[in-house]
Curated annotation (Swiss-Prot):
NDH-1 is composed of 14 different subunits. Subunits NuoA, H, J, K, L, M, N constitute the membrane sector of the complex. Coiled coil: none annotated. GO terms for biological process: ATP synthesis coupled electron transport. It comes from Legionella pneumophila (strain Lens). It comes from the Bacteria. It is a multi-pass membrane protein. This is NADH-quinone oxidoreductase subunit N. The lineage of its organism: Bacteria, Pseudomonadati, Pseudomonadota, Gammaproteobacteria, Legionellales. GO terms for cellular component: plasma membrane. Its main location: membrane. It catalyses: a quinone + NADH + 5 H(+)(in) = a quinol + NAD(+) + 4 H(+)(out).
Length: 480
């Protein structure tokens, strides 16, 4: 028992989120009639404390606890920190949106916290068992959150699609894990790696099938082509506050799962999984960018944009070097912050009975709220990869990692798709600044929301001007 509880302190961020979720659930049940937003405040405090602990742990020793089920290292601490930050932003931006539409606010925060707990377990998983446990704990609350607006038929349809596709993906992943366990008799990722190295020649067909099934499951969670079919429909059909949540932190956790499995469990058959990742990365960047160009509805546009960004993150994984893995980690952390800002504007502007649905709803935003338009301009520039925003460095590091391993042709293709992608981001900027507004009313989002949103967007500029600290943290995470 003492051995099991030794070094349990490294799981403090998860414990804080679990306690917070339970407190938010009970307080919403018993005290909601006295203080409507009590679950919101408890959730925010818990997330901030969890983020602070994760930040303090960065740079500490790597530890394996709970009989090697759970790993504590810089990769997990960085991911947990950014998961907490993006979940906090999602909660803050969504508060007024949920209240106005009289949606069950307590349910949203509690489900969000349990999903966050799943994400944190997922990025610290060192066993196939913990990987699957974390994945399901992350996914199941997301299905319920998508259908949280019970009277909305679009949301119910989106939730059903999400659930059915998610169940198929989970089944494929579980089947892949069962094949690995059947072939090796091991669940710990290092033990799996050793068994694969020894038995690959004799059981290569079985391992190949397992790898394909597992990568298919991971591809679904990332919304990478050809497992992306659910993303545009779910992003469009779900309430904007839920789309905001789905588009940020779960992407970090899903890439964390991919990195754990590929860089530890399947490290000896890197050349085999590179072929699958190559196809997924190329198709994601290509199809994501090309289909985003023709979209007129903003949530669908950002869904295809998300698919293309996942493709770029997979380029880093494809490089199969410590620099490539660090670039992929850096990319997904920054993407989550950018996505929180982009969907944050949609949620914050969807007030007073108005729902931001079409790109045309942003027409003339510069005349209606110049500061908000400037913040969104920073987000669009960062997503397009325009210096001095941080989006430039994310793409630069990923493409440099490809060049370093002599995949220059792939870096050129990635650069070409970046140019195509810039078109639809700049189209939004053009609409905000040069088109006449259809509604002349001033856009007001409240002082608190303006401050938080400004910090979110200005961080993209700050990290672009001073990128060194975060890049160094990502490189050190894989160097160790």
């Amino acid at each position: 028992m003492m051995t099991l509880l030794e070094n349990i302190h490294v799981a403090i961020p998860e414990m804080i989120i679990l306690i917070t979720a339970c407190l938010a659930l009970l307080s919403d049940l018993f005290f909601r009639h006295k203080l409507k937003s009590i679950a919101f405040y408890i959730s925010c405090v818990g997330i901030i404390v969890s983020a602070a602990v994760s930040f303090v742990f960065i740079g500490s020793y790597k530890l394996l606890i709970f009989n090697k089920l759970f790993i504590s290292d810089d990769i997990s601490h960085l991911m947990k920190l950014f998961i907490d930050i993006t979940v906090l932003l999602s909660f803050v931006y969504s508060q007024n949106y949920l209240d106005e539409r009289q949606m069950p606010t307590g349910d949203y925060y509690v489900l969000g916290l349990f999903s966050t707990l799943g994400m944190m377990i997922l990025v610290s998983a060192h066993s196939l068992l913990t990987l699957y446990l974390g994945l399901e704990l992350m996914s199941l609350p997301l299905y319920a959150m998508t259908a949280i607006r019970r009277t909305d038929s679009d949301a119910s349809e989106a939730a059903m699609k999400y659930f059915v596709m998610g169940a198929i993906a989970s089944g494929m992943l579980l089947y892949g894990i069962s094949l690995v366990y059947g072939a090796t008799g091991k669940l710990d990722l290092l033990d799996v790696a050793n068994a694969v190295a020894v038995n690959w020649q004799q059981q290569n067909t079985l391992f190949a099938f397992a790898m394909v099934f597992i990568l298919a499951g991971v591809g679904f969670k990332l919304a990478a082509v050809p497992f992306h079919m659910w993303a545009p429909d779910v992003y469009q059909g779900a309430p904007s506050s839920v789309t905001l949540f789905i588009s940020t932190a779960p992407k970090i956790a899903a890439l964390g799962m991919a990195l754990r499995f590929l860089t530890i469990g399947l490290v000896d058959i890197t050349m085999q999984w590179q072929q699958i990742i190559l196809v997924m990365a190329l198709l994601s960047t290509g199809i994501g960018n090309l289909l985003a160009v023709i979209q007129t509805r903003i949530k669908r546009l950002l869904a295809y944009s998300a698919i293309s960004h996942i493709g770029y993150a997979l380029f880093g994984v494809l490089a199969a070097s410590s620099a490539g893995y660090a670039a992929a980690l850096y990319y997904i952390l920054i993407y989550a912050v950018m996505s929180a800002a982009a969907f944050g504007l949609v949620v914050l502007m969807s007030n007073h009975g108005m729902e931001i649905d079409s790109i045309d709803d942003l027409k003339g935003l510069n005349k209606r709220n110049p500061w908000l338009a400037f913040m969104m301009l920073l987000v669009m520039f960062s997503m397009a990869g325009v210096p001095p925003t941080v989006g430039f460095f994310t793409k630069l590091l990923v493409l440099k990692a490809l060049v370093d391993v002599h995949m220059t042709w792939l870096a050129v293709v990635g650069l070409l798709f970046t140019v195509i992608g810039a078109y639809y981001y700049l189209r939004i900027v053009k609409i905000m600044y040069f088109d006449q507004p259809e509604n002349e009313a001033i856009v007001k989002i409240g002082t608190g929301n303006t401050i938080v949103y400004s910090l979110n967007c200005l961080s993209l500029l700050y990290l672009g001007i001073f990128p060194g600290a975060l890049i160094a943290a990502c490189i050190n995470a894989f160097a160790n």
